[in-house]
């Protein structure tokens, strides 16, 4: 009985050491390492698809309803449970879950776009990236789409969270190209 107990303890110790000695410093199986993400035309196409997937989530639900509530397009009724009351009154804070979700998801989208734009900028720096002229032109189109997506996200955030423009209190832009 004592020998069986010792054998069990030794076997359990060996098994534990065997399991914990595995190499766990690996990238997740469903992710591409950052340095390998944008090195082929396929990588750019997949990143572009990731940017476009943003539109699925950011063009429906609370994202569409919030500005309508802020613009008084919807008015509260007796049984609306004050779900968007803070937005309706323009008294919302960053702790409001709707505001936090909209803010964080748009900035996550901007982060994806910035990663893509940075990757396009590094094409010429990386001698391992070999692209045909047609592929370079296609990536330039994708880059333009990325800039549009970033502008869309900033526009939406400004529409929801910025004050109205007031000429009287606006800063004077000196040496501005756009007059």
Q: Residues of each region from the PLM?
A:
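Primarily recognizes Gram-negative and organellar outer-membrane beta-barrels
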Residues: 71-73, 133
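A general secondary-structure boundary signal
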Residues: 10, 20-21, 80-84, 114
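Generic structural "secondary-structure junction" signal
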Residues: 26-29, 34, 40, 89-94, ...
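Sec-dependent bacterial lipoprotein signal peptides
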Residues: 1-20
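Secretory-pathway/luminal and periplasmic proteins that interact with or process carbohydrate-rich
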Residues: 56-62, 76, 153-164
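Conserved, well-structured interaction surfaces
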Residues: 82-161
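Membrane-proximal, proline-rich intrinsically disordered regions
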Residues: 22-71
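Short, flexible helix-coil linker/hinge segments at the edges of structured domains or between repeats
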Residues: 167-179
């Amino acid at each position: 009985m004592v020998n069986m107990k010792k054998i069990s303890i030794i076997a359990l110790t060996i098994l534990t050491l065997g399991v914990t000695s595995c190499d766990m410093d690996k990238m997740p199986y469903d992710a591409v390492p950052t340095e390998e993400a944008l090195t082929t035309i396929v990588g750019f196409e997949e990143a572009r698809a990731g940017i476009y997937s943003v539109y699925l989530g950011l063009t429906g639900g609370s994202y569409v309803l919030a500005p309508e509530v802020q613009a008084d397009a919807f008015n509260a009724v007796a049984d609306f449970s004050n779900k968007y009351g803070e937005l309706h009154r323009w008294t919302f804070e960053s702790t409001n879950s709707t505001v936090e979700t909209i803010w964080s998801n748009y900035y996550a989208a901007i982060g994806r776009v910035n990663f893509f734009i940075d990757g396009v900028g590094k094409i010429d720096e990386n001698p391992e990236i070999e692209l045909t002229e047609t592929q370079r032109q296609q990536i330039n189109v994708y880059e333009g789409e990325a800039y549009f997506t970033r502008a869309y996200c900033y526009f939406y955030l400004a529409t929801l969270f910025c004050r109205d423009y007031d000429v009287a209190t606006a800063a004077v832009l000196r040496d501005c190209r756009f007059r």
